[in-house]
């Protein structure tokens, strides 16, 4: 207990210095000024005339205030632990346990704040559009795509993010051929951009009667959902819009009306589709949002003027192109080939514990 307490008190000093450095990079005075300006803006006459814009300003005001409050709260808690240490009597195990627990909690929260300070790209705070596609591997690959879908769903639950299914195409025999989700929450894109690439699975195939080892691939594509002030104009002449009957898990509304929408951007050949809503108008609106995100990504790839984290094409979905390997047999190991971070806790990873991989990539 004494040795662990000493280690945590040493860690506390390190955390205090880290927080001080972050305070300088955050520029707290500027944040407080921005918070005051946003508060005044929200009090202006006619503020709610443009509801969407007003909601975005309100959300921005909350984000800024939350960041200020979080930083101040962490500083106060460090001070409280230091006071507790001074007041602690000899052999006071209860207070020692309290200090150890609080320093561990502070360490985790300061690490999160550090990452969110790094996530300063234009789109990092945005919601994310996450698309999974089956690669090489047949039914095994479809099953692998569904496993990844569960992994990201559980990760989102841990983060407090909400999910909305935009498009879903089941596999012929098992699993999922492709699925597109909207991940809603602050920094959803900033975190998930670290997952963009090819994911490889090695295991004994449940679809092979001889129990042979099978390698499967799936791709992960991540785009930011644009806000109104990041919007772009698209010439209607450049679009081909097709409607079709929605498929899916069944129900009285499935396959009865042509509510699903597919939009093709003729100059680039980009195709997006949405079948989530019962309304054709809603599906068209969602699909247009996805198209704009893809066009923004295309522009950033071509010019590399604003941000670097949208660059890079997905390679062919096969050997040698993966960003991460998930090996279930002949041993258990998940390894990220970009950072060399690895773990033998395969079940934990598939249960959504992927922050170690994401944070290592963002710090690299």
Swiss-Prot record:
Keywords linked to the UniProt accession: Cytoplasm, Methylation, Protein biosynthesis
GO CC annotation terms, alphabetical: cytoplasm
Signal sequence, renumbered to the chain: none
Source taxon at top rank: Bacteria
Compartments where located: Cytoplasm
Keyword Transferase: no
Molecular-function GO terms, alphabetical: translation release factor activity, codon specific
Post-translational modification, as annotated: Methylated by PrmC. Methylation increases the termination efficiency of RF2.
One Pfam family matching this protein: RF-1
Modified residues (N5-methylglutamine): 252
PROSITE patterns: RF_PROK_I (PS00745)
PANTHER family tied to this protein: CLASS I PEPTIDE CHAIN RELEASE FACTOR, PEPTIDE CHAIN RELEASE FACTOR 2
Record's function text: Peptide chain release factor 2 directs the termination of translation in response to the peptide chain termination codons UGA and UAA.
Family classification: Belongs to the prokaryotic/mitochondrial release factor family.
HAMAP family associated with the record: Rel_fac_2
Protein name as annotated: Peptide chain release factor 2
The species this protein was found in: Clostridium perfringens (strain SM101 / Type A)
Taxonomic lineage: Bacteria, Bacillati, Bacillota, Clostridia, Eubacteriales
């Amino acid at each position: 207990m004494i040795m662990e307490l000493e280690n945590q008190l040493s860690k506390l000093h390190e955390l205090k210095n880290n927080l001080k450095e972050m305070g300088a990079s955050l520029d707290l005075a500027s944040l407080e000024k921005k918070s005051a300006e946003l508060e005044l803006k929200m009090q202006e006459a006619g503020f709610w005339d443009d509801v969407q814009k007003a909601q975005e300003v309100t959300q921005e005001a909350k984000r800024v205030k939350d960041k200020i409050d979080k930083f101040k709260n962490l500083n106060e808690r460090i001070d409280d632990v230091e006071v507790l240490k001074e007041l602690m009597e000899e052999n006071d195990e209860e207070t020692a346990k309290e200090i150890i627990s609080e320093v561990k909690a502070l360490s985790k929260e300061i690490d999160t704040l550090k990452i969110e300070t790094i996530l300063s790209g234009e789109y990092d705070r945005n919601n994310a559009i996450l698309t999974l596609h089956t690669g090489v591997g047949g039914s095994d690959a479809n099953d692998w795509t569904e496993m990844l879908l569960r992994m990201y769903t559980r990760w989102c639950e841990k983060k407090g993010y909400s999910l909305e299914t935009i498009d879903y195409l089941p596999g012929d025999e098992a699993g999922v051929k492709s699925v597109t989700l909207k991940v809603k929450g602050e920094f959803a894109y900033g975190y998930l951009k670290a997952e963009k690439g090819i994911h490889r699975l090695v295991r004994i195939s449940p679809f092979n009667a001889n129990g042979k080892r099978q390698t499967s691939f799936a791709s992960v594509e991540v785009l930011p959902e644009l806000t109104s002030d990041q919007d772009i104009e698209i010439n209607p002449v450049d679009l081909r819009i097709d409607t079709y009957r929605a498929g899916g898990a069944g129900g009285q509304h499935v396959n009865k009306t042509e509510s699903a929408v597919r939009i093709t951007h003729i100059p680039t050949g980009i195709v997006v589709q949405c079948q989530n809503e019962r309304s054709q108008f809603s599906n068209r609106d969602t699909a247009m949002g996805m198209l704009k995100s893809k066009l923004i990504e295309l522009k950033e790839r071509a010019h590399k003027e604003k941000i670097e984290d949208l660059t890079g094409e997905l390679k062919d979905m096969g050997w040698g192109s993966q960003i991460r390997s998930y090996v279930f047999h002949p041993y258990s190991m998940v390894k990220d080939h970009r950072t060399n971070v690895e773990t033998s806790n395969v079940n934990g990873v598939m249960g959504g514990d992927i922050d170690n991989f994401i944070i290592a990539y963002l710090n690299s």
